[in-house]
A protein has these predicted regions:
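Ampiphathic alpha-helical segments that act as solvent-exposed interaction surfaces
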Residues: 6-10, 64-101
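Low-complexity, intrinsically disordered/propeptide-like segments
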Residues: 13-17, 39, 45, 70, ...
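Amphipathic, interaction-prone secondary-structure segments
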Residues: 18-66
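Amphipathic alpha-helical segments
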Residues: 5-20
Length: 101
């Protein structure tokens, strides 16, 4: 499955900063999980859908420049807190507040 540029940009930035992340993408959603120091997980998500012409991204608000960002309360819990659309650079600022493992 093709990965959106915004997700690739985020993952490159995380790698450049040596910030660990996990790919939890599914059939119709790109998910980048970033474990936080407090045991929570920051989930950065881009939804997409498949058409007869191929993969279309952009179900996420703010796409193509932003990802939906939510807190997951544990690795086993898919219940999201309120999400917000953020650029990869804004996500790094959020990580500065929460700290990463």
């Amino acid at each position: 499955m093709a990965i959106s540029k915004v997700t690739k940009d985020l993952r490159r930035l995380l790698d450049a900063q040596n910030i660990p992340w996990e790919d939890h993408s599914g059939f119709s959603t790109e998910r980048t999980w970033i474990p936080l120091d407090n045991g929570l997980v920051l989930c950065c998500m881009c939804s997409y859908y498949i058409t007869s012409d191929g993969v279309e991204h952009g179900v996420t608000s703010g796409f193509p420049l932003k990802l939906e960002v939510s807190i997951i309360y544990s690795i086993d819990d898919y219940a999201f807190g309120p999400g917000a659309a953020k650029t990869p650079e804004e996500i790094l600022e959020v990580l500065g507040i929460y700290g990463t493992k």
